[in-house]
Amino acid sequence: FFSLIPSLIGGLVSAIK
């Protein structure tokens, strides 16, 4: 579960950038 959190955050940051 905790592995999914950084993945989602990374995806959002990548989408924003």
Swiss-Prot record:
- As stated in the Swiss-Prot or TrEMBL entry, residues carrying the post-translational modification Lysine amide are 17
* UniProt key word Transmembrane: no
Q: Does the keyword Secreted belong to this entry?
A: yes
Tissue expression remark: Expressed by the venom gland.
Provide the leader sequence positions.
none
Entry similarity comment: Belongs to the non-disulfide-bridged peptide (NDBP) superfamily. Short antimicrobial peptide (group 4) family.
Name it. Peptide TtAP-3
